[in-house]
Amino acid sequence: MSPFRLGAKISLSLVFFTSLAFAGGESSASQVQPIMMLPFAVLLIAIAVVPFISRNWWKKNYPYVAVGLGLIPVVYYVFALDNGARMLQIGKEYISFIVLIGSLFVVSGGIHLHISGNSTPYANVTLLAIGAVAANILGTTGASLILIRPFLRVNKYRMRGFHVVFFIFVVSNIGGALTPIGPPLFLGYLKGVPFWWILESIWYMWLIALVIVLAVFLVIDTISFRKFEAGPKHLLRSQLHEDAEVNGMHNVFFLAVIVAAVFVETPSFLREALMIAAAAGSYFTTRNEIHVKNDFNFGPIKEVAILFVGIFATMVPALDWLELNAGSVGLTKAGQFYWGTGVLSGVLDNAPAYLNFLSASIGLFVDKNIVAEVNHLVASHGAGMTAISSVRADEIRNTFAALTRFHPDLVAAGSVPLSVVQVSYLLGNRDLYLKAISVGSVFFGACTYIGNGPNFMVKSIAEQAGVAMPSFFGYIGRYTVPVLLPTFALIWFLFFRS
């Protein structure tokens, strides 16, 4: 299938499903049978295991697996629970999610960077640090796809698997913890988490984790570099004489459009329309030779789009069950949310993990009576604030204060979506839990190849370039356990253990 036909099919599908999703109102969680969480577990286990058992079978059949399992909860909600609005709501979130990462994927594929100079350990650390910052501007997907090829080229004479692993650690995951330009934090932004709140709240955790991981990389790369220097010098000299090259710089404009579109909230379809327009503009104005140099094709984003149709559909019963039963499973402390979100992010995927534990925190702490009181205050524009006599009056006031601070336009309009009220309760009363969920989901996404969307894309690009990458379990045993787990344990000890 040609890229044009593929793009046309995706665009038409998005238009159709967007019309359905945005037509549905916001619905509350439904009481579901625990067995309905089974398709979610089966799909995520299949994603983690089946490609390593039979890669060819998986490549041929993963669309049927994802869509087939996804249809089970859709049918259950529509016909058994009579709550089709819940699926329409999650469809809206899926569309926002896939349009964002898809547009970043297309635009970043139109930028070709070639970096000249010597591949030294300090140069590599600098490039990774730049990538960490870029991940907060372009999203982890955009930064990863723009920088992985230059990173591979500059290290091509001494490239080892650990170079790519640490690239995944820093650029594809930990680096992007400060802004919601990409999953999983973008999903929280859609629920009402303010854009700049994350940066203001966790920058020091981000800095500590980043410094530790980069320091470990510097030690390992220094050892590798010394071994390389003892080898043939002509390889090093030939690299120094290669010219720097930048092509497709007009795509920076389209990246800016996508980033700016993240801030667009009304009308509800405009953000996605701007992103799709930017992606189309980038694709059709980029010279084919640039796409060829970047080995650009739609395969990776097609796989992500199809798999996440199944993930988003099957995770709804798990989200609803956790929201309504969080207390019964013993989740009470911020540290438990940190490790719980982290483990689920590492072994499954950090986007659904973030939503699962956000739902759990809402179910554990947010009382429907508080929501009703806050909605009354919003509708009356704060009238009667001093007359609140509930035993949870402070929580009500704190929630309304958070709404007024972070969502003044919604408060002024006199109507606030349920999810925004729920998130504002956490912001005003239990912000440590929201920090734990945010940090756990982003950081631990680096623990496996399937922890975050860009991980597999980066691995695939590296393998196409001839890099011998560690296996699924080799990645965990050689890098996650000795490097990441002690780092994340330190973050827990410093900020979440109490």
Task: Identify the residue ranges that each predicted region occupies.
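Transmembrane helical segments that form the transport core of multi-pass membrane transport proteins
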Residues: 257-369, 373-398
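Membrane-helix boundary/coupling elements in multi-pass transport proteins
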Residues: 140-147, 183, 345-359, 441-459
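Hydrophobic, small-residue-rich alpha-helical packing segments that form membrane-like cores
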Residues: 143, 156-198, 202-203
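Helix-loop-helix module between adjacent transmembrane segments
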Residues: 105-115, 130-143, 171-179, 205-214, ...
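Hydrophobic transmembrane alpha-helices that form the pore/transport pathway of multi-pass ion
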Residues: 122-174, 356-439, 465-470
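Juxtamembrane and boundary regions of transmembrane helices in multi-pass small-molecule transporters
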Residues: 178-179, 188, 196-239, 390-394, ...
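Hydrophobic transmembrane alpha-helices of multi-pass small-molecule transporters
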Residues: 2-109, 117, 204-323, 480, ...
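Long, structured ligand/cofactor-binding scaffold of large enzymes
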Residues: 80-153, 157
